[in-house]
A protein has these predicted regions:
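Extracellular "leader-to-stem" segments immediately downstream of a signal peptide or signal-anchor
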Residues: 2-96, 100-193, 197, 206, ...
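Short glycine/acidic-rich loop motifs that flank beta-strands on beta-rich extracellular proteins
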Residues: 74, 87-88, 108-110, 129-130, ...
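Conserved short loop/turn motifs at secondary-structure junctions
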Residues: 79-86, 237-239, 326-327
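Active-site-proximal loop/turn and secondary-structure-junction residues that shape catalytic pockets
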Residues: 83, 213-215, 264-266, 298-300, ...
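Right-handed parallel beta-helix
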Residues: 101-102, 139-148, 192-202, 215-228, ...
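Extracellular beta-rich repeat passengers
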Residues: 300, 320-471
């Protein structure tokens, strides 16, 4: 079967199509923050004792300004120009936390300045350091300005790599990411009507912006630059985690892991929580270095559904669209609609797998720990998930109006004999790649006006592929 330049017959028809041939998506009009703090009284952190020298801890002074602002019914917390060193800050209802141009908020390099809080990290609920900026259990908060938030994360990167070097030979790759505590830069959790806009984030110690168990949130016009002074592990750009009605737009992300990532818990703990990520719009964003322009997973346990991503650009990102899970995650990822995408210098345009990073995904206790008292998060990770609950599903994924240049591989898709990759639709795609790639365990796919120009002139390799028709 030649797949280098082809047009395939439409095979899967969704229940409702609009005039343009796309599924009805009225839900896209009901995403993002619906309101922002309106009060205009300004509370300068400098009036509460913050010093703009980049060395003196301003945590207490900045928090005093935040508390005073909230106590007066809301307003603007702002800074005079300069550099401010801080540990964890906790925003409150009605506060606009403004970091103006000429201001740099520096994250402390001391882990003790980030108190442990109950949260979820990489799909598991556990105690973990609070972020530098926290929006927890509240509503109507905004974080913005033209300034810079610099996580000073390299010290935490180095600590992670040192621990991983120690853990991997002992069969502990599966737990090192959880034992190596690192602060996120901005955490929004259990909150509603939150806006993050116009800021530049640099050198995050861990995930940069994490939206967890929240709804009606907007991330707009942010720049993320985590490729500074080293290779930062798990320095994701924007993570949307078991949250709904989220809008991400006009952002530029350069990081060392997933650029924009949708998550919903992992393994036994994620299946217990069982909260989906749903109704997400992502538009007009650029991804530079990173692991995925748009990633779903690998934490899929609660399900990921109803996602529209459009107007995206990938410039050197490792993978364009990445769907990843493991055979102990479970969950259904479906109704993922991606259109108007340009990709250049990506390694793989579409990667989909149900067996992602086995050393990380499957937990096994080494014999040296038998009979020992284990940390709670170890016990959660070691809970066995049966094959029925643990099998993930990917279906109803649409990719349309995509241009690919100077890239290595068009697709690398691998389902499972118990869970085929189902009902994928590809339309109006022009790809110049080194090779077409491979598809295993796929069913009911449709390709319309798809051109793949592969340098090696070899066809797309198909195994266990059903109902892929062409004309």
């Amino acid at each position: 079967m030649k797949w280098l330049s082809l047009t395939l017959l439409l095979l899967v028809i969704p229940p409702v199509l609009n005039a343009a041939g796309w599924p009805e998506m009225s839900w896209t009009k009901d995403v993002g923050a619906r309101r922002r703090p309106a009060a205009s009284t300004v509370f300068l952190v400098n009036d509460y004792g913050a010093v703009a020298d980049g060395r003196t801890s301003g945590t207490a002074a900045i928090q005093k300004a935040i508390d005073a602002c909230a106590g007066k019914g809301g307003g603007i917390v702002s800074f005079l120009p300069g550099k401010y060193l801080s540990g964890s800050l906790f925003l409150k209802e009605g506060v606009h936390f403004q970091i103006p141009e000429g201001v740099v908020l520096l994250g402390s390099t001391q882990l003790s300045d980030y108190p442990d809080i109950p949260t979820r990290v990489a799909g598991v609920e556990m105690m973990w350091p609070a972020a530098l900026i926290n929006v927890l259990g509240t509503e109507n908060v905004s974080v913005g300005g033209k300034g810079i938030v610099h996580g000073q994360g390299k010290v935490f990167w180095d600590a992670y790599w040192a621990l991983r070097k120690e853990y991997e030979p002992r069969g502990l790759r599966w737990i090192v990411d959880y034992d190596s505590k690192r602060p996120r830069t901005l955490l929004v959790a259990e909150s509603t009507d939150i806006t993050v806009s116009d800021l530049t984030f640099q050198q995050s110690g861990f995930w940069t912006i994490h939206i967890l168990y929240s709804q009606y949130c907007t991330v707009d016009n942010v720049v993320i630059q985590n490729n500074i002074d080293g290779h930062g592990p798990s320095t994701d750009g924007i993570d949307i985690d078991s949250s709904s009605k989220i809008l991400v737009q006009n952002s530029d992300i350069d990081c060392n892991d997933d650029n924009i990532c949708l998550k919903a818990g992992r393994d036994a703990d994620g299946l217990r929580v069982n909260r989906p990520t749903e109704y997400v719009v992502i538009r007009n964003c650029i991804s530079r270095a990173g692991a995925g322009l748009l990633t779903c997973g690998s934490e899929t346990s609660g399900g990921i559904r109803y996602v529209l991503a459009e107007g995206l650009r990938a410039k050197g990102t490792s993978v364009g669209v990445r769907l990843k899970s493991a055979m102990n995650r479970g969950g259904i990822t479906e109704h993922i609609y991606i259109r108007d995408v340009d990709m250049e210098n990506v390694r793989i345009v579409l990667e989909a797998t149900m067996n992602w990073n086995p050393a990380y995904s499957y937990s096994k206790l080494p014999g040296e720990f038998n009979g020992r008292l284990l940390p709670d998060h170890w016990n959660k990770m070691l809970q066995v998930v049966d094959s029925v609950r643990g099998t993930p599903f990917f279906r109803n994924v649409w990719l349309s109006d995509v241009k690919i240049r100077n890239s290595a591989e068009f697709m690398r898709v691998s389902g499972n004999k118990t869970s085929y990759m189902e009902q994928f639709s590809f339309r109006n795609i022009d790809a110049q790649v080194q090779k077409a790639g491979s598809v295993n365990y796929a069913r009911n796919w449709e390709f319309t006006n798809v051109t793949i120009k592969a340098d090696d002139l070899k066809e797309l390799r198909l195994q266990h592929a059903e109902n892929l028709q062409k004309k």
